[in-house]
């Protein structure tokens, strides 16, 4: 199954609370922190909401 490599490249400081919450729920704790998540519609939706703050790469398992 495909996975997504998500990296926080911009700080969520100064953005709306829901965007900060989305970054937190993705598991991104600090700048340049990377997590690997399953490629599901729910995760894609979260990434779409904060696409201006993160960098996303597809990874094959």
From Swiss-Prot:
Q: Which residues form a coiled coil?
A: none
Q: Name one GO cellular component term.
A: cytosolic large ribosomal subunit
* Keyword NAD tagged: no
Single Gene Ontology MF annotation: structural constituent of ribosome
Is Ribonucleoprotein one of the keywords UniProt gives this record?
yes
Which Pfam families has this protein been placed in?
A: Ribosomal_L30
Key words of the record: Ribonucleoprotein, Ribosomal protein
Q: Which GO terms describe its biological process?
A: translation
Xref: HAMAP family: Ribosomal_uL30_B
Per the record, the similarity remark reads:
Belongs to the universal ribosomal protein uL30 family.
Assembly description? Part of the 50S ribosomal subunit.
Q: Which PANTHER family match?
A: LARGE RIBOSOMAL SUBUNIT PROTEIN UL30M, MITOCHONDRIAL RIBOSOMAL PROTEIN L30
Q: What is this protein called?
A: Large ribosomal subunit protein uL30
Recorded source organism is Fervidobacterium nodosum (strain ATCC 35602 / DSM 5306 / Rt17-B1)
What is the name of the gene encoding this protein?
A: rpmD
């Amino acid at each position: 199954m495909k996975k997504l490599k998500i990296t926080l490249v911009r700080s969520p400081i100064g953005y709306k609370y829901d965007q900060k919450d989305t970054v937190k729920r993705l598991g991104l704790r600090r700048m340049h922190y990377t997590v690997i998540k399953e490629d599901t519609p729910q995760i894609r939706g979260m990434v779409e909401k904060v696409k201006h703050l993160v960098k996303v790469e597809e990874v094959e398992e």
